[in-house]
Amino acid sequence: GGHSLLLDGGDVNTGVPESDLQDAVPDFKGMNLLGYQAMAVGNHEFDKPLAVLKMQRDLAQFPMLSANIYEHGKRMFDPYKVFTVGGLRIGVMGFTTEDTYKLVLPENVKNIEFRSVTAEAAKVVPELRAKVDVVIAATHMGHYENGNHGTQSPGDVELARAVKGIDLVVGGHTQNPACMKAENVLDRAYVPGTECKPDRQNGTWIVQAHEWGKYVGRADFEYRNGEFKLVKYALIPVNLKKPVKGADGKTTLVPYTEEIAEDPDMLALLTPYQAFGQQKLGIEIGASDGRLEGDRAVVRAKPASLAVLIGLAAMDKTRADFAIVNAGGVRDSLAAGKITYKDVLKVQPFGNTLSTVDLSGSEVMDYLNAAAKMSVGSGAFAQFAGVSLEISSGKVTNVRINKAPLDPGKTYRMVINNFQATGGDGYPKVSDHKSHVNTGFVDADVLRAFIIKHSPLKAADYQPGDAVVRR
């Protein structure tokens, strides 16, 4: 027996080229078929123009929820939805990271406010409590260990600590399993298929099913005599596989747990969309003799070869002296072997354009110092190409461009993407600088052309080496 609610923590948009090409229509239709009942609005929902988001909201046969997004002073989405499940009244409210405004293009969020989550929750929770037995928050704010959110906006832990009366948070955004090793200590070595202990803060359970559909999170609760009790929780791997070496020395991929069979109705729904995407994106454009590193955990923490490639491609196209690449703009690695246009779009899915700005040497130093302060682990983390430097305590020294020491009186051309140029990720806004030019060159197209021109790529040519030293 029992009853269920199927919820999502947001970010349906961006990252899968076949989906991006089709404005996530196949994703929303698939979610409709699965019977989703509500989702939080994620920051990536604003990667495309508002007309696309509003089309998606109409397409979804379930509410997209966010209590803290306001358009022209009014809530853009429903703040919550009340469900009656087995005679129990359950209120599901939605919240979106306050960082959204700096994670997307400014023109996509014009006249939109991302208000304080805790302030909005302090209003919504009492309102819901008067109507329901159980309060759940579907959020896209992130799970930060012990509430240590650094330069990011507050996440689920901080929400639970600040606002009493939330029974469960179903979260997203930080892309981790949110399994705990001890109180306020994340299990950073979680193995798929093993026990996952959810976080608990101020009487609120907090769960997050990692990323990209790798898991379905299942939380079983009982409600008796006014008490909402967690009976068990599991992260169920969705056909995740691990490499296993056989007696013959060959490595094969084996499921962590029992394989889940394809659903014929879902397959029939999605196959035409997949075929259309493959037709458009499966063209081989080049090859690389080695892996070019762009994985999230690497590119947001230290210099990475794929970011160097992206920066050099942008420099080549715009005749710039150096490039700064925000780590959040690098979404995947390029494996050794053939490279398709789809691979490029997985790396750079946002359709950003390249911006150039001609700066004096002293202006360059100011900008580099600002970039150097971008925190490790965030999408703002700065990657560099064409420049060598040392960073110590957030200060930049020993800057060399074109292998020569930085000259305060000389003019240098910097290339970044238009998102950074307009102040995205907290970068200094340079779009109003007298020399700023939005070239209109789309980043993925520039990378594609560079790969075609220089293929086969020699991975060794793009290794960051010791060009950027952090002390």
Show which residues each predicted segment covers.
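Non-catalytic terminal accessory segments
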Residues: G1-S4, A130, L230-V231, V238-R471
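Acidic, metal/ion-coordinating pockets
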Residues: G1-K241, A268, A301-A313, L354, ...
